């Protein structure tokens, strides 16, 4: 079998490539990246004969249509703006796929994918991704699911790569429409830095203040898990949160152009370019990823609570920034192998909780050092 890894030499997805080389059984793994030198260097560094590098331009839709049919699975690690064209191309040519993020319009291709007897799974990272498996695990233990509370701490700097800066700024942008929580049968919009509460994450992250974040679990789980309430809250390191808050308070998310020394540009564009260039926005004392889920429901009519959380090796063992990136990249590798190994029976465009068995997903995570722990109690 052949796997195609889009953006496979990027900041996040290079860890997917490494994981595929170590754990997967593919006959060939092609690292497709716009930066061919980075892809070549990664392939040489890993030193696995199954790996090869190939130039790939995500702006060239025609090249996707020509390239994808030669593979058994397309693994998309590109920035989220390419989610929709990659999904569309996979479905047009009938090749299974998955990606690390989610774009709302992807779900519109569900029926077409079913007609091709194929599956595409958006959002197979940490959150969404591991969190979906956690929620499914808890839901499987309950007769009724009343409330799913997802909390994450993405401990990385705001701008280690352009795509990650886009994600950071989008999650706190005042015009982001998908910052929702679900309650009483309705999706309710929340502004940036609303819904504040304290969550105690495993060390080295510890207790952090989280707020509502726009994530797809809120959209999918009322339907897939029958949850009456769903929310996603998250945070970045304190110094990153200060940047997001400062930009909001001072109107720096504005897209209205201003004139600075004869140059017309919006405050947002100025800040984006500035944050990409300042060295401090690529630094953080702790690289880590914390996930904590509290799921409330009923068993035999009695109220219960299931708390699940993840733990992983510290940055000293996992190589600095890899302690963050692996939490996103490893699930993408696992998800791909489960599709091609025949462990995913779902068809269409489906979220992770509808595609993957949580127990099996956790087994594979544990092999790599990411351990999901659980406490179930009657209330």
Task: For every predicted segment, state its role.
Residues 4-19:
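N-terminal Rossmann NAD(P)H-binding glycine-rich loop of SDR-like oxidoreductase domains
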Residues 46-60:
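Rossmann-fold cofactor-recognition segment
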Residues 68-77, 97-99:
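N-terminal Rossmann-like NAD(P) cofactor-binding module of classical short-chain dehydrogenase/reductase
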Residues 100-120:
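Rossmann-fold NAD(P)-binding glycine/threonine-rich loop
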């Amino acid at each position: 079998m052949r796997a195609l890894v889009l953006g496979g030499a990027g900041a996040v997805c290079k860890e997917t490539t490494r994981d595929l080389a170590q754990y997967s059984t593919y006959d060939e793994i092609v690292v497709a990246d716009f930066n061919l030198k980075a892809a070549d260097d990664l392939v040489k560094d890993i030193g696995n004969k199954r790996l090869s590098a190939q130039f790939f331009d995500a702006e060239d839709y025609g090249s996707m249509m020509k390239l994808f049919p030669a593979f058994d699975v397309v693994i998309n690690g590109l920035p989220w703006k390419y989610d929709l064209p990659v999904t569309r191309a996979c479905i047009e040519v009938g090749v299974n796929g998955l990606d690390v993020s989610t774009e709302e319009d992807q779900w519109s291709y569900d029926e077409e994918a079913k007609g091709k007897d194929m599956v595409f799974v958006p959002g197979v990272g940490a959150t969404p991704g591991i969190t979906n498996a956690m929620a499914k695990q808890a839901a499987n233990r309950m007769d009724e699911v009343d409330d799913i509370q997802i909390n994450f701490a993405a401990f990385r700097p705001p701008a280690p790569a352009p795509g990650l800066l886009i994600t950071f700024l989008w999650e706190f942008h005042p015009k982001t429409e998908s910052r929702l929580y679900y309650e009483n049968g309705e999706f309710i919009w929340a502004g940036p830095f609303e819904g504040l509460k304290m969550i105690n994450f495993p060390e080295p992250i510890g207790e952090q203040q989280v707020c509502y974040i726009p994530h797809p679990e809120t959209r999918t789980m009322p339907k897939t898990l029958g949850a009456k309430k769903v929310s996603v809250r998250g945070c970045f390191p304190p110094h990153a949160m200060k940047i997001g808050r400062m930009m909001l308070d001072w109107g720096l998310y504005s897209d209205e152009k201003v004139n600075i020394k004869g140059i017309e540009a919006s405050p947002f564009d100025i800040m984006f370019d500035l944050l990409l260039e300042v060295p401090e926005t690529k630094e953080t004392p702790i690289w880590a990823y914390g996930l904590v889920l509290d799921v409330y429901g009923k068993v035999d009519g009695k109220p219960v609570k299931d708390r699940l959380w993840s733990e992983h090796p510290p940055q000293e063992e996992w190589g600095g920034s890899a302690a963050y990136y692996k939490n996103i990249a490893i699930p993408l590798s696992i998800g791909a192998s489960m599709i091609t190994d025949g462990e995913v029976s779902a068809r269409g465009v489906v979220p992770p909780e509808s595609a993957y068995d949580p127990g099996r997903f956790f087994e594979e995570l544990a092999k790599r050092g990411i351990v999901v722990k659980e406490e179930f109690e009657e209330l």
